[in-house]
């Protein structure tokens, strides 16, 4: 029988490598278990060796080694050899009791509970204790809660503590929402340097330089005696004189005109409009965005063309992530672009049962990219998105489940401040290819013989009179306080170009002249509001015979509606076949920034 040493040598020879004499194992749960036991000791006040007293005399018994491990502040205090290192109790000034409780909870559990009421005080405590990871969590929470009412306060707070990311993100938000923010009370409390930092940027979202001037005057008048001496410097650094209208300049009071004329040696303010860069908001152009368009040379590759009708140019928007198709689309009143749901195309040419997605994305104009937001509660294809009462609603759509294709009646609500969705009362019937309109804090939903009104504040659905010619897959638009319902498919499965108008205040329907299209061209129609007027974007197909060979030709055209004449006129035709539009293409109108997009034509 071989001795143990011989067996070891035999194994080395068989394996061809020296046998290992040690084993290095890692217990993945060890750190978590240690943390749990330390938390238990803290909760039971066992083996504690330091008492921390904060504002209002509140005390906390805890462990020096835990505090020193997460905080350089405490590590220095307990190891420096100073008086505090040997004291049983230490007092911390400037930290609230709730904040200290949250810091200790974070130290012993790695978890933190943030609210709008505690986040700034906790950030302050984390700053004092030099815990950057906790500071960053607080900063991200504040960034996620930015709105026109609090962004100035957050910016000033970040500036005071020198947190670069929070300062930059809040400043970017102020510039983006400047017209809303400049009227807020906190705007008047900005320091001169903070005001200049915001106003001297190219990224300021204003359509006229006059808004910048007015905001400075508003800021000055709040504390004129102290700020008057700063006015020439603020004007010199922030106002771009060539961008001010001559008529506006002539109306400026003499004292302000004198301040504007000082520092006239600044060349950037005297070299004419051509040498003075425009603000971001001045470059915005209202464009038609076409979703679910196919690339000209490959039908499988999606592209998102943007038509600047006024300038006669074509741009390209960043396509939806994961090549999502048939998404719900919303352009908010603040020009934010959202997409939700849809499906990812299959590699199979014959697959029609697409898997619904719950993804939710917001478009970032400056970066021409899509930013992820919290996904919907329910995956859905072709849902409708509506902004109402400060929140976003996703209604209906379809999924492929169980016995096949199923329409949905569920509705959910998105709160941007909390970045979360909640379910609300479902629609009375399941719907897909329906139309939704928001008007005076109500959501109107139309499909076939169904016409409903939803009150978000009461979470209640009401019934309204159906249209005269019920039809599905029609198109709805709000124009002059009326809902225009255009085209669709009748009960006999025939397409119709009927136009009906619902007067919301009068609660009545009336007919308008039918659309001037030929059934033979198989037009696919989308309704738009462009420059305040009702338009139709139409994809029409023509069949031509050339030397006994049938050829098809598609044209994409824009028609404008004349309210008084009740007449549609073609006003634009897209460049020939830059892309292909399928049956499920969608068109929306939004203000976009050409310099942020890829130019196509």
Curated annotation (Swiss-Prot):
GO biological process, one term: neural crest formation
Top-rank taxon, per record: Eukaryota
Protein name (database record): Kelch repeat and BTB domain-containing protein 8
GO MF annotation list: ubiquitin-like ligase-substrate adaptor activity
BTB domain: residues covered: 48-116
Keywords in alphabetical order: Cytoplasm, Cytoskeleton, Golgi apparatus, Kelch repeat, Repeat, Translation regulation, Ubl conjugation pathway
Family note: Belongs to the KBTBD8 family.
Keyword Repeat attributed: yes
Species per Swiss-Prot/TrEMBL record: Danio rerio
Gene giving rise to this polypeptide: kbtbd8
Chief location bin: cytoplasm
Domain BACK stretches: 151-253
Gene Ontology cellular-component annotations: Cul3-RING ubiquitin ligase complex; cytoplasm; Golgi apparatus; spindle
Subunit (UniProt): Component of the BCR(KBTBD8) E3 ubiquitin ligase complex.
Kelch repeats: 336-390, 391-441, 443-481, 482-529, 542-588
């Amino acid at each position: 029988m071989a001795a143990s040493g011989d067996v070891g040598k035999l194994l080395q020879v068989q394996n061809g490598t020296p046998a290992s004499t040690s084993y290095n194992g890692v217990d993945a749960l060890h750190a978590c278990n240690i943390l749990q036991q330390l938390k238990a000791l803290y909760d039971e006040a066992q083996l504690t060796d330091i008492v921390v007293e904060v504002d209002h005399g509140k005390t906390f018994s805890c462990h020096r080694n835990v505090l020193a491990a997460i905080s350089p502040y405490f590590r220095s205090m307990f190891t420096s050899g100073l008086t505090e290192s040997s004291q049983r109790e230490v007092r911390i000034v400037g930290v609230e009791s709730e904040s200290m409780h949250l810091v200790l909870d974070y130290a012993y559990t790695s978890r933190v509970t943030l609210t709008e009421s505690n986040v700034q005080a906790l950030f302050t405590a984390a700053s004092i204790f030099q815990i950057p990871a906790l500071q960053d969590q607080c900063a991200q929470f504040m960034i996620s809660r930015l709105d026109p009412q609090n962004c100035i306060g957050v910016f000033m707070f970040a500036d005071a503590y020198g947190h670069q990311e929070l300062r930059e993100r809040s400043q970017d938000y102020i510039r983006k929402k400047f017209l809303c923010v400049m009227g807020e009370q906190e705007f008047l409390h900005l320091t001169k340097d903070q005001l200049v930092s915001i106003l001297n940027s190219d990224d300021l979202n204003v359509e006229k330089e006059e808004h910048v001037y007015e905001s400075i005057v508003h800021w000055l008048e709040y504390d004129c005696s102290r700020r008057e001496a700063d006015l020439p410097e603020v004007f010199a650094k922030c106002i771009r004189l060539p961008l001010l209208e001559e008529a506006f300049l002539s109306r400026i009071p003499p004292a302000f005109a004198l301040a504007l004329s000082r520092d006239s040696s600044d060349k950037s303010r005297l070299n004419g409009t051509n040498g003075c860069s425009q603000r971001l908001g001045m470059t915005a152009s209202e464009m038609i965005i076409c979703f679910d368009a196919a690339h000209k040379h490959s039908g499988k590759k999606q592209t998102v063309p943007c038509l600047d009708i006024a300038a006669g140019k074509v741009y390209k928007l960043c396509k939806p992530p994961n090549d999502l198709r048939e998404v719900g689309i919303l352009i908010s009143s603040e020009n934010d672009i959202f997409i939700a749901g849809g499906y990812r195309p299959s590699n199979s040419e014959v697959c029609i049962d697409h898997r619904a997605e719950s993804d939710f994305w917001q478009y970032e104009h400056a970066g021409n990219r899509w930013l992820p937001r919290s996904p919907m509660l329910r995956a859905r294809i072709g849902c409708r998105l509506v902004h109402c009462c400060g929140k976003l609603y996703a209604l209906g759509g379809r999924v492929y489940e169980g016995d096949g294709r199923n329409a949905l009646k569920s509705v959910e609500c998105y709160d941007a401040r909390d970045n979360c969705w909640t379910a609300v009362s479902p629609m009375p019937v399941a719907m897909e290819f329906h139309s939704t309109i928001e008007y005076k804090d109500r959501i109107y939903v139309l499909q076939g013989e169904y016409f409903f009104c939803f009150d978000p504040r009461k979470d209640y659905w009401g019934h309204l009179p159906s249209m005269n010619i019920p039809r599905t897959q029609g198109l709805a638009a709000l124009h002059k306080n009326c809902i225009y319902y255009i085209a669709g498919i009748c009960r006999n499965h025939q397409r119709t170009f009927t136009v009906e108008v619902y007067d919301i205040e009068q609660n009545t329907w009336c007919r308008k002249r039918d659309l001037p299209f030929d059934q033979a061209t198989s037009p696919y129609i989308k309704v738009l509001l462009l420059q305040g007027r009702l338009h139709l974007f139409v994809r029409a197909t023509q069949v031509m015979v050339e030397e006994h060979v049938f050829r098809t030709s598609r044209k994409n055209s824009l028609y404008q509606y004349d309210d008084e004449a009740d007449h549609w006129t073609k006003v634009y035709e897209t460049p020939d076949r830059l892309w292909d539009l399928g049956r499920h293409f969608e068109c929306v109108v939004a203000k976009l920034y050409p310099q942020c997009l890829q130019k196509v034509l």
